[in-house]
Amino acid sequence: MKRISSARVLQLRGGQDAVRLAIEFCSDKNYIRRDIGAFILGQIKICKKCEDNVFNILNNMTLNDKSACVRATAIESTAQRCKKNPIYSPKIVEQSQITAFDKSTNVRRATAFAISVINDKATIPLLINLLKDPNGDVRNWAAFAININKYDNSDIRDCFVEMLQDKNEEVRIEAIIGLSYRKDKRVLSV
């Protein structure tokens, strides 16, 4: 709630001062401030000349911050920046090669979300790996990313068939959606 309130205040204030403040938060010693700074940089409108700098700050946080919470927020914010400017898609692919294997569940979930924002078949092996993650939220976001981007191959379909038995209801629903969309008759076994 604190993040959203902070972001709204800064969005309303807008301008370079708000961007500078968010950037300053990103290098704070306190992880909560870094998390808020990363969140704000994903949401706030920034000038074109600042985009590269902001994306690079977020990417650096994604790969190097000590706090898994901050890394996850930075990943989500890079995805938000990418939605505003798809030129950053290759950088999302590149960072995902690392973050998809992070020990933090939140980082892996954020990675699956970030991959859902881009459409790059190079991410399919990462998504298939995330479909097999021990955490249901990660599996659900990976399945969502596959479905939203309409990726299809036999490995994806086989994973979706296995996911029909998943203990997580949202994962099962994404698997049903995925198999139905692909007109795979194995969905009828549900």
What are these language model-derived features?
Residues 2-14, 35-49, 69-87, 106-120, ...:
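Structural detector for internal amphipathic alpha-helices that build alpha-solenoid repeat scaffolds
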Residues 13-27, 47-62, 84-100, 120-132, ...:
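Amphipathic alpha-helical scaffolding segments comprising HEAT/armadillo-like alpha-solenoid repeats
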